[in-house]
Amino acid sequence: YKHRILYYGPENVSEISSQLERLHANKTNLKQIPNKKEFIEGTMDKPMVYVVDYDMKQAEVMMLSKGDKVNIDDVSKYCQIKFHNEYFGGGMSSIVFQEMRESKALAYSVYSTYTLPRDTNASHYLMSYIGTQADKLSEAMIGMTELLDVMPEAESNMKNAKEAIEQKIRTERLTKSKVLSEYEKAQKLGINYDVRKDLYEAVQDFDMNSLKDFHNSHISSGTRVVMVLGSKEDLDLEILKEYGEIKHLTLEDVFGY
């Protein structure tokens, strides 16, 4: 099949090219790469709750909402997303982790992140995950919903988020195959430079208003779809009905076999 060759190393381009001419076989009559299967993103026009019955004591919950298509010309949004994720739901010092696990003990695992698509045909998604005991499902879902609806303001957390982003960029080194993989990811988005430069410069000027504006525009709004994995014997369906129409899925529905 037709292909490309990526190289990272000490040799210059002309030396590598001459070696490839000599050593690389199968350079002619190459087949076209088959078109990849396109998976169409579903619409989220009404609240739904998808439930999969699985024999387990815990409940796994994902609250999902769909955002806009990625816009490669709006690098400022990329910076806002990275800052909000770090502050709100991306790590152990985030608001979501501290509120849901540390303060209220409502989850053994929890996060909330606004995704960064890997190509220009994909949309942003807000993904908020809760791993909790089945008997804490109601409290956990209420707690997460409250955080999504109204973002708590904590100056110390905001400062830590800025410092974490700056420190990561200062110390992170892209070397060897990582250079190639990062280049490929950027190319898929139509970007021809290292956007971490923009992030490092932008985060200096971000403040609590920046976080609130992004949260109100992209997190608080939007139709939410809830996905729940757990034992149907332990899940309270009356509680789940409050979040949308319930649809039970079989393992065949999920995996296709």
Enumerate the language-model features and the residues they cover.
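M16 family metallopeptidases and their MPP-like homologs
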Residues: K2-Y8, A59-V70, F97-D213, S221-L229
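An aromatic/glycine/proline-enriched structural segment found at the starts
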Residues: H3-N71, V228-Y257
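A generic secondary-structure signal for well-formed alpha-helical elements
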Residues: E15, L23-K31, G91, K104, ...
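Short beta-alpha junctions and helix-cap segments that line functional grooves
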Residues: N35-K36, K212-H215
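Short proline/glycine-enriched turn/loop segments at secondary-structure junctions
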Residues: V51, F214-S217
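Active/ligand-binding-proximal structured segments within catalytic/core domains
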Residues: M63, D73-G89, S94-Q98
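Solvent-exposed, non-transmembrane alpha-helical starts
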Residues: I72-K77, L137-A140, L237
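A C-terminal, polar beta->alpha supersecondary segment
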Residues: S93-S94, V179, D253-Y257
